[in-house]
Amino acid sequence: MGLLSILRKLKSTPDQEVRILLLGLDNAGKTTLLKQLASEDISHITPTQGFNIKSVQSQGFKLNVWDIGGQRKIRPYWRNYFENTDILIYVIDSADRKRFEETGQELAELLDEEKLSGVPVLIFANKQDLLTAAPASEIAEGLNLHTIRDRVWQIQSCSALSGEGVQDGMNWVCKNVSTKKK
Amino acid sequence: MAAMALRRLLLRYFPPGIILEYVEGVESKTKSIDLLDLRPDTDVTALVEEIQKREPLITASCLEHVVCLVQRLQEKLGEKQNHKFSLFKVLRTHILPLTNVAFNKSGSRFITGSYDRTCKLWDTASGEELHSLEGHRNVVYAIAFNNPYGDKIATGSFDKTCKLWSTETGKCYHTFRGHSAEIVCLSFNPQSTLLATGSMDTTAKLWDLEKGEEVATLNGHSAEIIALSFNTTGDRIITGSFDHTVGVWDVGTGRLLHTLIGHRGEISSAQFNWDCSLIVTGSMDKTCMLWSAVTGTHIATLAGHSREVLDVCFDYAGQRIATASADARVYNAGTKQCIAKLEGHEDEISKVCFNPKGNCILTASSDKTARLWDAATGHCLQILEGHTDEIFSCAFNYKGDTIITGSKDNSCRIWH
């Protein structure tokens, strides 16, 4: 990728390019989701200390997806990446009930960010392959998603591991990009 | 005209030259005699005669001394270098990926920029962190020492500001505000009186270091400026832009002198050669171009790469050019012929540089390795392995016996 490629992906993108920010707590499955989107091997994924960027073609768009590490000590740096974001994807580990409050808090703070104001948000209720996973409806309720009124939003249950539900989410992304970009 | 008197002669190893300190009237001045073509087997007597003819300050009384200096330069050039580099230290105090790295002139200190919004100053010999320069509100991307002095550090950030720091104390002297987008390149002028910054806002700015004020805005590009560089004398600056062109500006007036038009893709890199006669540019259009720095006319296109050219540089003497793409290449700046292909990296090469002596080339790649190459033959001399993610930046110290590499894996490595 190199620093120069990062600069190219940083500038305001032409109509056919979409900048997607992938956020969520550590171990939510962001990198697995990113690799699933890029059809890459997902068997050896380690915690992201910085960021990963991949470009994927979908429905006539070039989706530049930025996967940002979610560990607590590096969450204050999420802000480094807000500029020119077209779509926010927020990933939740649906089986990690102990941290629903924490993840809800982080999401609420993101939605308050000026640089992300009005940016459509897709919430992936990930890890539905686990038996203990909470259904998307329960998460939506727990996180009070229905109170989001300043932007379009969607919650989509998925398994980044199996790929189930991922494409449905990305369809929503492309649909909502097209209304914004065109 | 005031009388001129030579005070003393100094050596400059890279590029080879002799510096004359002299007094004119009451003023103390310096000038240099560049010996860019000097080789270990150059006829010293003939060369010194030539120098004497050209330079009135060199009188019969100091000829012996000049001969001695030239011989020292030749010895330096002739030194066999089979230094094997090995890992000395891994520095892990940045908590997010590194951006750029830079040495001071003597190589005693170096700096690293990071996504963690800091720039750190390190002691090269011990690997100890001397200062963490904190205050930016976003990624610290572009960094520089005011070489050859090295007493100041400049940092350019995605927070749209640039800061000037004291190397000694780590205190911030000035914060330069005015750009309306990320600052991604910067450079001190050789006199260390000005700082130039290039931004994604399509402008470059010149700042007065003493006053802490903006001196000029270089307005003319229609897209992001991602590279800039002063010439050796400091009276010209070039800006490379995503608008496919390079601007040549007069530093004194801030006026655009030439626009180098010809590339069919974004510019990735642009540099003057030592004697300020040539400009080399690299582009996403897979080519490099050579231009006359004086007239701004196109001289040659260095084609051959099959992918985007991500970096390009002259050697210290300005006689050869190294280019980075999927592979790296070395060209003769005079004949424009490709001298060597540096093949072996398994992913794109994002940075390339010569060692000061010019016999060795260092490349940094997305394949997580840095490699050393023989500049004449293109043979890979060494693979520096250990980083666990892409290497974004690399640098040689002036002596050429220490290398630093900065990586997306959040670490910086020192190699001896």
Swiss-Prot record, chain A:
InterPro entries on file: ARL2/3, P-loop_NTPase, Small_GTP-bd, Small_GTPase_ARF/SAR
UniProt keyword Disulfide bond, yes or no: no
PROSITE patterns recorded: ARF
Keywords assigned by UniProt, alphabetized: Cell cycle, Cell division, Cell projection, Cytoplasm, Cytoskeleton, Golgi apparatus, GTP-binding, Lipoprotein, Membrane, Myristate, Nucleotide-binding, Nucleus, Protein transport, Transport
Function summary: Small GTP-binding protein which cycles between an inactive GDP-bound and an active GTP-bound form, and the rate of cycling is regulated by guanine nucleotide exchange factors (GEF) and GTPase-activating proteins (GAP). Required for normal cytokinesis and cilia signaling. Required for targeting proteins to the ciliary membrane by releasing myristoylated protein from unc119 cargo adapters into the cilium.
Family stated for the protein in its record: Belongs to the small GTPase superfamily. Arf family.
PANTHER family tied to this protein: ADP-RIBOSYLATION FACTOR-LIKE PROTEIN 2-RELATED
Name of the protein in question: ADP-ribosylation factor-like protein 3
Origin species: Taeniopygia guttata (Zebra finch)
Gene name, Swiss-Prot/TrEMBL: ARL3
